[in-house]
Design a protein with these regions (language model features):
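Conserved N-terminal entry element of GNAT/NAT acetyltransferase domains
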Residues: 1-11, 22
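A short helix-loop-beta-strand connector motif used in the catalytic cores of GNAT acetyltransferases and
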Residues: 45-60
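Conserved beta-strand in the GNAT
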Residues: 60, 66-75, 91, 96
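Conserved acetyl-CoA binding element of GNAT-fold acetyltransferases
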Residues: 83-99
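Conserved acetyl-CoA pyrophosphate-binding loop and the N-cap/start of the following alpha-helix
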Residues: 101, 105-113
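Conserved GNAT acetyl-CoA-binding A-motif
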Residues: 111, 118-131
Length: 134
């Protein structure tokens, strides 16, 4: 196994969008017959805007040339609170590893990179929802 972790850029829109649909199908137990065209289109536009304005960071993981995993974090603002005076928050999402690559620390390393990105932006309020898959 020869893993590389790449911060996604605008050139990765197609792969990010394709992976987002895979994650949603898996997390929601949707068949390939379920129409996801609208979600796919909106996901593409989301990544297009968010990658450029810095409100989303994603990592792509490859074993040599083969895509094997991903993870992302979106940044947003809420009203300031006592415990979060800046109001900045991060939401980790779209964590995915190909089944045959699971239990090898790929998601853990990706998660660590995403948390570090949030901390580097001064964000301390970070959340993540997990599915039954992990």
């Amino acid at each position: 196994m020869e893993l590389t972790y790449k911060k996604a850029t605008i050139e990765d829109l197609d792969l990010l969008t394709e992976t987002r649909i895979k994650v949603l199908r898996a997390a929601n137990q949707l068949s390939d017959k379920e129409d996801m065209k609208e979600v796919e289109k909106e996901s593409y536009h989301y990544y297009q805007k968010a990658l450029l304005d810095g409100s989303h960071i994603a990592y792509l993981v490859f074993d040599r040339e083969r895509f094997v995993g991903t993870g992302g974090v979106c940044f947003f603002q809420v009203m300031p609170t006592y415990h979060n005076p800046c109001g900045k928050k991060a939401y980790i999402m779209n964590m995915y590893t190909l089944p045959e690559y699971r239990r090898r620390g790929i998601a853990a390393k990706t998660l660590d990179m995403l948390v570090k990105d949030a901390w580097n932006k001064g964000i301390r309020a970070i959340s993540l929802e997990a599915t039954d898959m992990g």
